[in-house]
Curated annotation (Swiss-Prot):
One of its GO terms (molecular function) is zinc ion binding. NCBIfam families: alaS. One of its GO terms (biological process) is negative regulation of DNA-templated transcription. It is found in: Cytoplasm. InterPro entries: aa-tRNA-synth_II/BPL/LPL, Ala-tRNA-lgiase_IIc, Ala-tRNA-ligase_IIc_anticod-bd, Ala-tRNA-synth_IIc_core, Ala-tRNA-synth_IIc_N, Ala-tRNA_ligase, Ala_tRNA_ligase_euk/bac, DHHA1_dom. Its cofactor is Zn(2+). Consists of three domains; the N-terminal catalytic domain, the editing domain and the C-terminal C-Ala domain. The editing domain removes incorrectly charged amino acids, while the C-Ala domain, along with tRNA(Ala), serves as a bridge to cooperatively bring together the editing and aminoacylation centers thus stimulating deacylation of misacylated tRNAs. This is Alanine--tRNA ligase. It is an enzyme of class 6 (ligase). It comes from Citrobacter koseri (strain ATCC BAA-895 / CDC 4225-83 / SGSC4696).
Length: 875
């Protein structure tokens, strides 16, 4: 009997756990460490920072079954889902990972053992083919000489994508960074299915199916294309759960595995469909998986970003339900069957089942109201069509009026061999966005909606004041011709010395003035290629076309420049002190402070903070020149300029250098020489997220002010200790030592008092069938002393049951002690639990000693009074 999909998933994880791998839970479908990624689409996503050296784990081997979505963005399988045997919007990627631990030999041997081992998947060895990168002789020899695969089933794949290292068998994270060859394992379904082995002209057939990709990360690709060997090569593998399930269950399509058969039957039941081969059943069975898990991971249907992708998938499923003849809302009814077939992987979904069902039901109900009318309109338009392309305006009208995502319209059209003018659709969509921005109403962020034709020339690198002309005015996000005194507005100039917020540096403040008017600028922002001066007209009136004198607040700008230059010095210093894994994750540079977020997986030690401070100040004392050059992006990278991971840059970039110490891409304003900074002080270091630290620092006058403040605090402390700041450390140590001595003496006194109290209490014990019972509430006794007292009393009383209680700050503390010879009849944990329940608490412990707490002090006397009857019944 073949394994179920759930059993296959578990077997994979169990196998690698037996090989020393940490079983790591699937991460969210919403990536939390990669803003460039729409959805988690591979098992390695959650380990990306580990492979990049930006994060460390307490394990060097890991295995996962990762939930993935490919629907939107670069990896978009949506239009193929339901029409092919192996495309899905949602799938599970089984993977094993080595972070500088094992490499090619073990990775290949592990894969072979799992696939062919009698106790594991037991696949026929003669059905397995492998590919290796053309020059990867090491992997080839492992497969041939150690595993024993015949040469005719080992295929070398070269650069088959038109460039060096552009190959199906060479994996790259990006243009630079970790990369390396990979070996892929294929399963031969047999000659009754059309297709040829990988690398052959017939490789696109369904006979030979890739089931496992094993990536060997052994190089670090540089900006100039050179490959540097990684000091600790790693392994990243991926095997689609649905694909291996199809192989192990002896079927040729993923949609024929047990998981999908069950879901397809559930879809047929809720839609009333009878033909189980209908492709719409496949579409819906696939889509319920992606939709349910996306909602469980916090995505909700909307018209933007991830929410819009979710909406598109839901509406595509609803439309296919309509094609099947569904008469009422059906999609949400599939969440329960989905949970049932997912096994342990569906536990989180089960916890959120009600919410997921409600979101799906609401979205389906909203779309159902317009679906039939929209389909009728589309049928009408297609009937009138003379060519083979539906115009973009009609596609947009279906979206705007009836809520049809363009890919849903394209789905309907494709079934009739008709294309959609998607460029025309996008043009109509952009026009609608423009109208929406202009007509924006109450409660909106008006300034964010401003769109300006034309550009402003920024001249603030060399000027802090210059003359310009007003090219546009905006009030509440709307273009106006003029403004009057008291009005808040955004003023756009043809040229300006004002720096618009960018790259972490805040926008400039200052004043625009001219004949009879003055405009106070409180912020400066970019609007496309234009620069907007945000503020209030203090006096007079201002209109488009007026000449103005633009004056930047030069003292504020000067402080910002110092902080920005210090940020660059600190970034370079952090990389020297902590390591080159340090990369900027965010920054804020204003006139008061600089804040810098960076990748590092532990809190900085005081010695490291001091070392960074000292190194930055050393560069300040060197008085290095701060120079800028405009050059091609690739030339800048070749020069060693640091670029931010995931940041987008133009082809021509501004490179800022500080002597031989720091080179970065930056468009901000800076000091002329590092000596201008004067002094650099770190005021705090903290964590903001996993693997991300934050430093706040001050420079110049701000740094001097912190020194004065610290000196004042030391003087205050010295006065309190009746000493001076020179010997403050010695004085504090003396006070702490004296405090420790006093605390020790106090503890001894408390213990003596407790012993005396115990002696007094022992006389109050009552005899119940040969067992001494002592129940007492003690005033003024610390809760932690109760245990000592119980131990003393047990020694004094012999066969005994003891319950002591005290109240401190309104909270009840309880302890029960039972001598060993009585625990077969009276359990301390049960006893203290009975009392705690009456005072609004709970607790437990061993049969001979147990503790509890409560919040209802008023109920304590009655609770203690109940002990005698409870114990008597047990004895």
């Amino acid at each position: 009997m073949s394994k179920s999909t759930a059993e296959i998933r578990q077997a994979f994880l169990d196998f690698f756990h037996s090989k020393g791998h940490q079983v790591v839970a699937s991460s969210s479908l919403v990536p939390n460490n990669d803003p460039t990624l729409l959805f988690t689409n591979a098992g390695m996503n959650q380990f990306k920072d580990v492979f990049l050296g930006l994060d460390k784990r307490n394990y060097s081997r890991a295995t996962t079954s990762q939930r993935c979505v490919r629907a939107g963005g670069k990896h978009n399988d949506l239009e193929n889902v339901g029409y092919t045997a192996r495309h899905h919007t949602f799938f599970e990627m089984l993977g094993n990972f080595s972070f500088g631990d094992y490499f090619k030999h073990d990775a290949i041997q592990f894969a072979w053992e799992l696939l062919t081992g009698e106790n594991w998947f037991a696949l026929p060895k003669d059905r397995l083919w492998v590919t290796v990168y053309e020059t990867d002789d090491e992997a080839y020899e492992i497969w041939e000489k150690e595993v024993g695969i015949p040469r005719e089933r080992i295929i070398r794949i070269g650069d088959n994508k038109g460039a060096a290292y552009a190959s199906d068998n060479f994996w790259q994270m990006g243009d630079t960074g970790p990369c390396g060859p990979c070996t892929e394992i294929f399963y031969d379904h047999g000659d009754h299915i059309w297709g040829g082995p990988p690398g052959s002209p017939e490789e696109d057939g369904d006979r030979y199916i890739e089931i496992w990709n094993i990536v060997f990360m052994q190089f670090n690709r540089q900006a100039d294309g050179t490959m540097e060997p990684l000091p600790k090569p790693s392994v990243d593998t991926g095997m689609g759960l649905e694909r291996i399930a199809a192989v192990l269950q002896h079927v040729n399509s993923n949609y024929e595995i047990d998981l999908f058969r069950t879901l397809i039957e559930a879809v047929a039941k809720v839609t009333g469909a009878t033909d189980l081969s209908n492709k719409s059943l496949r579409v819906i069975a696939d889509h319920i998986r992606s939709c349910a898990f996306l909602i469980a991971d916090g995505v909700v249907p909307s018209n933007e970003n991830r929410g819009y992708v979710l909406r598109r998938i839901i509406r595509r499923a609803v439309r296919h339900g309509n094609m099947l003849g569904a008469k009422e809302t059906f999609f949400y009814k599939l969440v329960g069957p989905l949970i049932d077939v997912m096994g342990s992987a569906g536990e989180e979904l089960k916890r959120q089942q009600a919410q997921v069902e409600q979101v799906l039901k609401t979205e389906e109900e909203q779309f159902a109201r317009t679906l039939e009318r929209g389909l009728a309109l589309l049928d009408e338009e297609l009937a009138k069509l003379s060519g083979d392309t539906l115009d973009g305006e009609t596609a947009f009208r279906l979206y705007d009026t009836y809520g049809f995502p363009v890919d849903l319209t394209a789905d309907v059209c494709r079934e009739r061999n008709i294309k959609v003018d998607e460029a025309g659709f996008e043009a109509a969509m952009e026009e609608q966005r423009r109208r929406a921005r202009e007509a924006s109403g109450f409660g909106a962020d008006y300034n964010a909606m401003i769109r300006v034709d034309g550009a402003s020339e920024f001249k603030g690198y060399d000027h802090l004041e210059l003359n310009g002309k007003v090219t546009a005015l905006f009030v509440d996000g709307k273009a106006v011709d003029a403004i009057s005194a008291g009005q808040e507005a955004v003023v756009v100039l043809d040229q300006t010395p004002f720096y618009a917020e960018s790259g972490g540096q805040v926008g400039d403040k200052g004043e625009l003035k001219g004949a009879g008017f003055a405009f106070a600028v409180s912020d400066t922002q970019k609007y496309g290629q234009a620069i907007g001066h945000i503020g209030t007209l203090s006096t007079g009136s201002l209109k488009v076309g007026d000449a103005v004198q633009a004056d930047v607040d030069d003292a504020r700008r000067a402080r910002i420049r110092l902080n920005h230059s210090a940020t660059h010095l600190m970034h370079a210093a952090l990389r020297q002190i902590l390591g080159t894994h340090v990369a900027q994750k965010g920054s804020l540079v204003n006139d008061k402070v600089l804040r810098f977020d960076f990748s590092h997986n532990e809190a900085m030690k005081p010695s490291e903070i001091r070392a960074v401070e000292d190194l930055v100040n050393a560069q300040i004392r060197r008085n290095l020149p701060v120079e800028t050059n405009i050059m091609d992006l690739e030339a800048a990278k070749a020069k060693g300029a640091m670029a931010l991971f995931g940041e987008k840059y133009d082809d021509r970039v501004r490179v800022l250098s500080m002597g031989d110490f720091s080179t970065e891409l930056c468009g901000g304003t800076h000091a002329s020489r590092t000596g201008d900074i004067g002094l650099f002080r770190i005021v705090s270091e903290s964590g903001t997220a996993a693997g991300v630290r934050r430093i706040e620092a001050v420079t110049g006058e701000g740094a001097i002010a912190t020194l004065h403040a610290e000196s004042d605090r030391l003087s205050d402390i010295a006065q309190l200790l009746k000493g001076d700041s020179q010997n403050l450390g010695e004085k504090v140590r003396s006070v702490l030592e004296r405090t420790r001595q006093l605390e020790k003496e106090l503890q001894q006194l408390k213990e003596q008092a407790a012993a005396q109290e115990s002696a007094n209490l022992s006389s109050k014990a009552v005899d119940i069938n040969g067992v001494k019972l002592l129940v007492s509430e003690l005033a003024g006794v610390e809760p932690k002393m109760l245990r000592t007292m119980v131990d003393d009393l047990k020694n004094q009383l012999g066969s005994t049951v003891i319950v002591l209680a005290t109240v401190a700050e309104g909270k009840v503390s309880l302890i029960a002690g039972v001598s060993k010879d009585v625990t077969d009849r009276v359990k301390a944990g049960e006893l203290v639990g009975m009392v705690a329940q009456q005072v609004g608490g709970k607790g437990g412990g061993r049969p001979d000693m147990a503790q509890a707490g409560g919040t209802d002090a008023a109920a304590l006397p009655a609770a203690l009074a109940s002990v005698k009857g409870w114990v008597s019944a047990k004895l």
